[in-house]
C-alpha cells in the first residue's frame, strides 16, 4: 500500500460620464448623447491564502519552513476596459449607463523535490481529527518518490451601473450633480492546488496526482446614490465623485478535489478517485449564501477638451466592498483522512469518525483601485 496543495466597478464610472457630457448643457442643442471608452489598470487587495500548503517538516516542529501557501497572493496589475454611455434629457436631467470588464489573470507558485539523496522531503501539513494531532502527507519522500506542488490564483472582475443624474444650478465654472441608480458587480476568484508524486526508479513508473480546487464567486446587486462636483474652465475639465451602494452580496463557493493514479490497478489505465488532500467529500460541492454589503466608491479625473465634442482624460478611483468570499480562506486544514484514497486508504475509502473538513464560509472585505486613460465623444 502506498502513501500515508467592487468593484473596480470601479474606475470613475460617473466621472467618465461627466467628462463625456462636458458642461451641464450641450455645446449645441443637438449634443445630447455621449460615449466614452477607457483602458484601465486595476490593483486588487491581495487574496488571503492563510493555510500552509507545503512545508519541510511537521507544522509544529521547531524551525519548520513554509514553502508554499501561508500568506497572500495577488495578480496585480490587472488590465481591463470600460464603456460609458450617457443621454442628457434636458439641461438638468441625464441618464448614464456604464459597463466594465477586467479579464481573468492568474499567478502561480510552485515547489519541487527530486527525491534523490540530499534533497528535502516535501510535506502537506494538516491537523488529523481522527487522532487529534498535527500530521503530514508526504508529497516527496526520499528515496521512494519525487514530488512537486503548485498553487494557482486566478481572478476576474466585471459589473455595471445605471444612474439618473440631476444637475444643480451651476456656480461659475463649478457644478454639482446628484445621482441615484442601480449597481451590479461580480468578483470571481479560483485557488487551485495540484501535486504530483511519482515513484523514483527502480520502482515501477506510476501516476499519483491530486487536484484541490476552491472557487469563489461574489455577485452584488444594490441601489446607490451619490454626488459629483465638476469643474469646467476653457479646455480643461475635472470632477470628483462619491457614491455609496447598499445591497446584497450573493456568495457562492465551489469545492472540488480528486486523485488520479494507477497505483491500485497494477499500473494500468489511470483511475480517478473523489477527494484530493484539502478538498474532500465532506466539504466538496456548491455552497451559497446572501450577505448584506456596502460598496462605497470615490473617484477623481482630469480631462482636456480637444474640441467641442472630443475629450481625453485620466482618472483614478478607489472602491471598497464590505463582504466577499475569497477562495483561499475557505480551506479548512482540520481533516479526517479516512475518507480519501489520496491519503493512502484502499479504494473505496470510507469515512470513519468526524466529517471534517467542513466549509466554514469565511468572508472578508475587498478593495480595488484603478488608473485609467479615456476618450469621450458627444454628439
Label the model's feature ranges.
Residues 37, 83-87, 160-166, 180, ...:
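Residues on the lipid-exposed face of transmembrane beta-strands in outer-membrane beta-barrel proteins
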Residues 19-36, 44, 48-49, 166:
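Outer-membrane beta-barrel biogenesis signature
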Residues 41-45, 101-105, 182-188, 233, ...:
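Transmembrane beta-strands of outer-membrane beta-barrel pores
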Residues 364-379:
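Outer-membrane beta-barrel "beta-signal"
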Residues 29-33, 81, 91-95, 172-178, ...:
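Outer-envelope beta-barrel architecture signal
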Residues 21-26, 89-91, 165-171, 229-235, ...:
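Outer-membrane beta-barrel proteins
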Residues 48-57, 61-76, 103-156, 187-219, ...:
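Extracellular/periplasm-exposed beta-strand and loop segments of Gram-negative cell-envelope proteins
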Residues 69-111, 159-161, 177, 184-186, ...:
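Glycine- and aromatic-enriched membrane insertion/assembly motifs of diderm outer-membrane
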Amino acid at each position: 500500500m502506498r502513501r500515508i496543495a467592487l468593484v473596480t466597478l470601479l474606475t470613475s464610472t460617473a466621472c467618465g460620464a461627466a467628462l463625456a457630457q462636458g458642461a451641464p448643457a450641450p455645446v449645441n442643442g443637438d449634443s445630447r448623447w455621449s460615449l466614452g471608452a477607457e483602458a484601465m489598470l486595476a490593483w486588487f487587495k491581495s487574496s488571503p491564502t492563510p493555510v500552509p500548503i507545503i512545508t519541510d517538516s511537521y507544522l509544529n516542529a521547531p524551525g519548520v519552513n513554509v514553502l508554499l501557501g501561508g500568506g497572500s497572493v495577488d495578480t496585480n496589475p490587472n488590465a481591463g476596459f470600460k464603456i460609458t454611455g450617457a443621454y442628457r434629457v434636458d439641461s438638468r436631467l441625464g441618464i448614464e449607463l456604464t459597463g466594465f470588464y477586467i479579464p481573468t489573470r492568474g499567478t502561480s507558485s510552485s515547489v519541487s523535490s527530486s527525491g534523490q539523496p540530499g534533497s528535502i522531503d516535501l510535506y502537506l501539513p494538516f491537523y488529523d481529527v481522527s487522532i487529534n494531532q498535527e500530521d503530514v502527507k508526504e508529497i516527496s519522500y526520499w528515496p521512494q518518490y519525487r514530488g512537486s506542488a503548485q498553487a494557482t490564483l486566478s481572478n476576474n472582475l466585471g459589473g455595471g451601473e445605471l444612474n439618473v443624474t440631476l444637475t444643480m444650478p451651476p456656480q461659475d465654472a463649478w457644478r454639482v450633480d446628484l445621482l441615484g441608480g442601480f449597481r451590479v458587480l461580480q468578483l470571481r476568484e479560483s485557488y487551485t492546488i495540484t501535486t504530483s508524486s511519482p515513484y523514483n526508479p527502480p520502482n515501477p513508473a506510476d501516476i499519483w496526482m491530486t487536484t484541490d480546487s476552491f472557487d469563489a464567486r461574489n455577485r452584488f446587486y444594490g441601489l446607490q446614490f451619490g454626488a459629483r462636483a465638476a469643474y469646467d474652465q476653457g479646455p480643461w475639465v475635472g470632477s470628483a465623485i462619491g457614491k455609496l451602494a447598499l445591497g446584497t452580496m450573493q456568495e457562492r463557493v465551489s469545492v472540488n478535489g480528486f486523485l488520479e493514479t494507477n497505483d491500485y490497478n497494477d499500473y494500468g489505465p489511470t483511475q480517478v478517485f473523489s477527494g484530493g488532500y484539502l478538498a474532500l467529500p465532506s466539504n466538496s460541492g456548491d455552497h451559497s449564501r446572501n450577505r448584506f454589503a456596502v460598496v462605497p466608491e470615490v473617484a477623481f479625473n482630469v480631462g482636456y477638451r480637444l474640441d467641442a465634442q472630443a475629450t481625453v482624460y485620466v482618472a483614478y478611483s478607489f472602491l471598497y466592498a464590505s463582504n466577499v468570499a475569497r477562495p483561499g480562506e475557505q480551506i479548512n486544514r482540520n481533516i479526517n483522512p479516512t475518507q480519501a484514497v489520496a491519503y493512502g486508504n484502499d479504494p473505496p475509502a470510507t469515512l470513519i469518525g468526524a466529517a471534517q473538513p467542513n466549509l466554514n464560509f469565511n468572508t472578508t472585505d475587498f478593495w480595488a483601485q484603478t488608473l485609467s486613460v479615456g476618450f469621450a465623444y458627444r454628439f
